[in-house]
Structure formats: C-alpha cells, structure tokens
Amino acid sequence: YPPKPENPGEDAPPEELAKYYTALRHYINLITRQRY
C-alpha cells in the first residue's frame, strides 16, 4: 500500500489542508481500487 498522507494538523494553512485532503482522497481511491 502507498503511505498514508500526513495530517497537517489544526493549525495548518488552508493550502496545506487542501493538499492533504486531495492526497487523502487519492490514497483512498488507490486502496479501494486494489481491494476489488
């Protein structure tokens, strides 16, 4: 499995949060695609 993205935390700037959520969505898609 690819590594899970690091949570930037509550105090992260909006750009970091957006990047994190994009990476997280991509990560979840990769994992769910591999499972089926």
Swiss-Prot record:
The modification Tyrosine amide is found at residue 36. GO terms for molecular function: neuropeptide hormone activity; neuropeptide Y receptor binding. CDD domains: PAH. It comes from the Eukaryota. Its main location: secreted. GO terms for cellular component: extracellular space. It is found in: Secreted. Keywords: Amidation, Hormone, Secreted. One of its GO terms (biological process) is neuropeptide signaling pathway. Belongs to the NPY family. This is Peptide YY-like. It comes from Oncorhynchus kisutch (Coho salmon). The lineage of its organism: Eukaryota, Metazoa, Chordata, Craniata, Vertebrata.
